[in-house]
A protein has these predicted regions:
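Divalent metal-dependent catalytic cores for phosphoryl transfer on phosphate-bearing substrates
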Residues: 24-26, 68-188
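Charged phosphate-binding loop/patch that engages nucleotide di/tri-phosphates or the phosphate backbone
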Residues: 195-228
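Short coil/turn segments at secondary-structure boundaries
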Residues: 36, 171, 205-209
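Acidic/His-rich, divalent-metal-binding segments that scaffold phosphate/diphosphate chemistry
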Residues: 1-104
Length: 228
């Protein structure tokens, strides 16, 4: 697979991603699979700028750390929508069973669009024998985010929403912004998502505005408001 060969990984790591790819191919529908690979590809693009290209001047230890962060990001991207292969009742049951390990309320579990992340992390962990907390956290919160997100989780949150298969009014501008300033892009993508939810008359995740305030606290000064 060309997309695997393009990843900045060791041969052993590429083989691991290749194995994940073969397994998800068996269970994802064509739309889910295309979105997964497109999300991974956009993660690769952003990671090159914000993870891999940042490491050479920081010493060998930090280069190794950056490569490890990047590998975990690739795994999370491959599995971020694993929960979508299950029906909502199953997802809700798994999420409710594990609610003590989620930053959510029982009411949040009535929001269908976030269940696949919350429950999918536990299901992917079990199915693919993934015990790494950072990978599972990336999967768990890729739809909603959390306060003080890591660079990898900023990347997967953004990539999921602006990968090349997405088509909505602001997406081209957001892609351009993502290559220039990841933090300002996070602010704009999060804002765009809140506006979409409100305009759709849908319930909002209980932590949304705390997360929004946290993003604004650090990055709000970077923005001049809406760009036309």
């Amino acid at each position: 697979m060309d997309f695997i060969n393009n990843l900045e990984l060791s041969q052993k790591q590429k083989e691991y991603i290749g194995d994940l790819n073969e397994r998800v191919l068996l269970v994802f529908n064509p739309h889910q699979y295309k979105h997964t690979i497109s999300t991974l590809s956009y993660c690769q693009k952003l990671a090159q700028i914000y993870i891999l290209d940042k490491s050479p001047d920081l010493g060998t230890e930090n280069i190794a750390d950056s490569n490890n962060i990047y590998f975990k990001l690739c795994i999370a991207a491959m599995l971020h929508d694993y929960g979508k292969i299950f029906n909502l009742d199953v997802l809700r049951e798994v999420a409710l069973k594990n609610i003590s390990h989620l930053n959510s309320t029982e009411s949040d579990l009535e929001i269908n669009s976030i269940l696949h992340g919350f429950a999918g992390a536990f299901m992917a962990g079990e199915e693919f024998d993934i015990k790494d907390d950072e990978i599972l956290k990336s999967i768990k919160y890729h739809t909603v985010g959390y306060c003080d997100m890591s660079i990898a989780d900023k990347i997967i949150y953004i990539a999921d929403k602006i990968e090349e298969g997405r088509n909505y009014a602001e997406v081209v501008n957001l892609r351009e912004l993502s290559l220039k300033n990841i933090n300002l892009c996070l602010l704009e993508v999060y804002k765009n998502n809140i506006i979409y939810i409100i305009r759709s008359n849908k319930n909002i995740y209980s932590e949304t505005f705390r997360i929004w305030n946290n993003i604004c606290k650090f990055y709000g000064g970077l923005s001049n408001g809406p760009r036309r």
